[in-house]
Design a protein with these regions (language model features):
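Hydrophobic protein-protein interaction segments
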Residues: 38-151, 155
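Short, charged amphipathic alpha-helical surface segments
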Residues: 1-33
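Generic alpha-helical structural signal
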Residues: 3, 10, 17, 44, ...
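Signature of lipid phosphatidyltransferase scaffolds
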Residues: 146-171
Length: 171
């Protein structure tokens, strides 16, 4: 048995250089891009990117935008959504049906719809956004603020499908 395992390990060792070469030669799908954002200003830019497009965006929500970019900036973006009739659907662990988080009040519900999912099914501890051909992570916790946008049609499509499954489960 030991000789068999040693032989297998030797074969794996020999295959590593070939694998490394192949990985180095592989190309990112044409048009794919990854963007990294840091700090409050970076997250402001990310949210701007989310609301500065025409189609509905989807997401998982950890906290409302006020927590990271401030209520004034967040309400400007929410107003932009209303003005442009940009719809959004979000899944959260807890929902605020009073809309107390925004000065726009329940008028914001014209473009924003949310549902709750039990944290035992899915514990949400960061935000995600899906829009166009973009899937984005937005993280803020204990002073750490960063985000990543993945610009890739297939990844966005898959994430959108997973969101729709969760949307049906959420209430």
């Amino acid at each position: 048995y030991l000789l068999s395992e040693e032989s297998r390990v030797e074969q794996l060792k020999k295959s590593i250089p070939k694998l490394v070469k192949e990985l180095g030669e592989s190309k990112v799908t044409a048009g794919s891009e990854v963007k990294y954002y840091q700090g409050t200003e970076g997250l402001k830019q990310m949210i701007w990117n989310v609301v500065n497009q025409k189609d509905e965006f989807l997401g998982l929500g950890y906290q409302d935008w006020n927590a990271t970019v401030g209520k004034n900036y967040a309400d400007k973006l929410r107003q932009k959504m209303l003005d442009n009739k940009l719809r959004s659907r979000e899944i959260l662990n807890e929902v605020d049906d009073s809309f107390a988080f925004t000065d726009l009040g329940k008028g914001y519900s014209q473009v924003y719809e949310h549902r709750a999912i039990d944290p035992k099914i899915l514990l949400i501890n960061h935000d995600t956004y899906i829009y166009g051909d973009v899937f984005a992570y937005y993280y803020h916790y204990q002073g750490e603020y960063f985000g990543v946008e993945i610009h890739n049609k297939e990844i966005a499509r898959t994430e959108r499908q997973m969101f729709e499954v969760l949307w049906k489960i959420a209430k």
